[in-house]
């Protein structure tokens, strides 16, 4: 019963588990997350859950059929870290931020002008660790692997709190 993403209009800040696709605007991302949330709360939930696992499709298209469309949404919001050429998903990558010669790039380095000045906060990338860039903040500091939990004060983007024990 949790949203796939949260958008704070007053702060122009979007919070998502893994990321948003570079071919989507902020409004489209919100709309796709809402579509998925409605399905998960409705009578199609069981069918969506039965069809949600898999690494395909890897390329976004408005023509994706319903289960491929939902799987793509789920993979972007919850699993995506890097993209290959033509903004295709690479869901197997688990390393640190790739170097320029690896033929992959972090999803947030797509130079998407559709995101304007929205700050996007995400996790799901403990190998990347805490990362603060002007528009992007990765808060995954590896708590699930026994490292610290990191939190951020949204009123002051650079005021961090690390909690070493839960």
Ranges and model annotations:
Residues 1-166:
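Feature recognizes metal-dependent phosphohydrolase scaffolds
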């Amino acid at each position: 019963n949790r949203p796939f993403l949260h958008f704070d209009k007053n702060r122009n800040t979007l919070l998502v588990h893994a990321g948003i696709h570079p071919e989507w605007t902020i409004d489209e991302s919100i709309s796709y997350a809402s579509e998925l949330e409605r399905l998960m709360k409705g009578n199609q939930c069981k069918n969506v859950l039965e069809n949600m696992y898999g690494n395909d499709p890897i390329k976004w298209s408005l023509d994706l059929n319903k289960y491929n469309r939902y799987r793509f949404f789920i993979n972007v919001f919850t699993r995506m870290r890097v993209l290959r050429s033509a903004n295709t998903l690479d869901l197997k990558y688990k390393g640190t931020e790739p170097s320029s010669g690896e033929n992959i790039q972090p999803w947030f380095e797509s130079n998407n002008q559709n995101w304007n000045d929205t700050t996007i906060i995400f996790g799901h990338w403990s190998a990347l660790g805490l990362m603060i860039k002007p528009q992007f903040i990765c808060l995954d500091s590896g708590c699930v692997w026994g490292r610290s939990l990191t939190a951020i004060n949204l009123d002051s983007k650079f005021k961090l709190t690390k909690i070493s024990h839960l």
